[in-house]
Amino acid sequence: YSLIHDDLPCMDDDDMRRGKPTVHKAYDEATAVLAGDALHALAFEILTDGSVSSDPFVQAELVRCLALASGMGGMAGGQAMDMAAESARYDLPTITRLQHLKTGALLTASVEMGAILGRVPPDARSHLINYARDIGLAFQIADDLLDHEGDEAKAGKALRKDDEQGKQTFVSLMGADAARKQARALVEQACGHLAHYGEDAGVLCDLARYIVERDR
């Protein structure tokens, strides 16, 4: 739902997403708003379905985790900062906070909800949460690099819009080479958080490395 809403004319105003027309282009703006709303509600419906967990305390914790990541202390707050960026001059710490909220919060929630379902105690989740926060930031830096120097045909969407809108990004503030090094350093740091899991964390580390090597 967040991508549908992000593409709306009142937000990022994108016509293409992964090589296909965005929902408001394929249908209309009202349909896009309602489709996003419906998918948002569906997420909570799924989390409280007995096939996910029959334990009401686990269900409540899952709902709270996603709600916190979606609201003003998470994605919505990050999007509000992003909208304000068109008329503001953000420094690197502010951009980092923006992206931790806009991109990282939901990604972190995805990892934390897996820990909740796996019955990992709250005080033992820090390694997983730190891993998710690092790859969330690495993902956004990689996204900024793709927007700066990527191929629109591969990306399936318009690129270089942040530059056109005068928004600060990791690339504009750090330069492409430094941003690329930072993304890779974050990936290695993320994998370091999982070191005590041994080979069991291999898939998660592979995912982290894919995030910064992708071309779309």
Annotated model-derived regions:
Residues Y1-A142, H148-G192, D200-V212:
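Mg2+-dependent prenyl diphosphate-binding active-site environment of isoprenoid biosynthetic enzymes
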